[in-house]
Amino acid sequence: MAYLSRATATLARQDCSNGCSASYAEEEELEASTESYDEEGGSEASTQTFRAKDLIITKADVLKKKPDPSSLVFGASFTDHMLMVEWTSKYGWDKPHIKPFENLSIHPAASVLHYAVELFEGLKAFRGVDNKIRLFRPDLNMKRMCRSAVRTTLPEFDKEELLQCVLQLIQLDREWVPYSTSASLYIRPTFIGIEPSLGVKKPSKALLFVILSPVGSYFSNGTFSPVSLWANPKFVRSWKGGTGDFKMGCNYGSSLLAQCEAAENGCHQVLWLYGKENRITEVGTMNLFLYWINKDGEEELATPPLDGVILPGVTRQSILELGEEWGEFKVCERHITMDDLSTALEENRVKEMFGSGTACVVCPVASILYKGQMLHIPTMENGHKLSSRIMAKLTDIQYGRIKSEWTLELP
């Protein structure tokens, strides 16, 4: 019997006049095209995967001092152990190994160092109000990681087996999960090509590893503090047919120059635009939502579609599903241009704008610097009722204040 049920996000989206994304059903078809799946036994490639039952555990002799949850800097502290699994085209997957946290030793010609043959994921473990440790929708992260592996020509693996190994890693380092409802344990699975050759080719060697980091707020200005955005069409994050809808390091390293310019202009994050119409796509490391009154006079929660340009975020999907469940306003995946936003602001039709992501959960937007003009977004003045409600709902689920099928409890 499979450890996790498959994601069943097949909600019908409203057919918006400005164009909608491929449905979740189509996304399932994409997965089926790269993986033959059997509900009882996992993928057909399972015989070529590593197995959690073969996991080797080597415990650290000396344990590190754990940081104070109230003073955590995002991604700066790491737990005592890590998970590593090696792969070669000749022998397939080696046994997974949990070992003391250590530096990696790879060949200077490793393909990850020269050609960015790499992908990663990001999810969290939360210590609930009942002291139980929960993961939030980890099946979606594993599914996305497998999808990225296909795009990167890295070997496939059974996502359920990886999740089982990750759970054992967290179990071993469970005291690193902060005793706090404002902090969590960030989980970073990473998959790299380590082909020791300067040839540009599919790697014959790869390394999958997972590290853990106790974290507080992602933004230095604190949890649920509004951010300012810098929008400049001279920079493009992704394009159709590219890799922008995959969780790959190359998408983030190439964004740093724009992020530096945003900071120089007094803004927290980059608002990425696309095409001649300057369509809104993503915000830095977040998906973007606009809560407004649309041109038809309807109260609407809108977000850019999954058209190959933006990352299919887990938090994004969860917010769409919550909106559909509440049924209090229209929920739509649609293209939104800067002209659409500017016009709506002039006509006082914008209620809130906010970003979403694993790191921040929900982050309100206060302003956008665009073409030398600061556009004021009235998120905070309007009471940020929807973004606050979404934030409360998701964190209540994550910290166990509300029972939900979206969480996976550690035994």
UniProtKB/Swiss-Prot annotation:
Its cofactor is pyridoxal 5'-phosphate. The N-terminus is blocked. One of its GO terms (biological process) is branched-chain amino acid catabolic process. SUPFAM superfamilies: D-aminoacid aminotransferase-like PLP-dependent enzymes (SSF56752). It is an enzyme of class 2 (transferase). One of its GO terms (molecular function) is L-valine-2-oxoglutarate transaminase activity. Gene3D superfamilies: 3.30.470.10, D-amino Acid Aminotransferase, subunit A, domain 2 (3.20.10.10). It is found in: Cytoplasm. It catalyses: L-leucine + 2-oxoglutarate = 4-methyl-2-oxopentanoate + L-glutamate; L-isoleucine + 2-oxoglutarate = (S)-3-methyl-2-oxopentanoate + L-glutamate; L-valine + 2-oxoglutarate = 3-methyl-2-oxobutanoate + L-glutamate. Brain, low expression in ovary and placenta, but not found in liver, kidney, and skeletal muscle. Keywords: Amino-acid biosynthesis, Aminotransferase, Branched-chain amino acid biosynthesis, Cytoplasm, Lipid metabolism, Pyridoxal phosphate, Transferase. One of its GO terms (cellular component) is cytoplasm. InterPro entries: Aminotrans_IV, Aminotrans_IV_CS, Aminotransferase-like, B_amino_transII, BCAT-like_C, BCAT-like_N, BCAT_family. Pfam families: Aminotran_4. Its EC number is 2.6.1.42. The modification N6-(pyridoxal phosphate)lysine is found at K247. Homodimer. Catalyzes the first reaction in the catabolism of the essential branched chain amino acids leucine, isoleucine, and valine. Belongs to the class-IV pyridoxal-phosphate-dependent aminotransferase family. This is Branched-chain-amino-acid aminotransferase, cytosolic. The lineage of its organism: Eukaryota, Metazoa, Chordata, Craniata, Vertebrata. The gene is Bcat1.
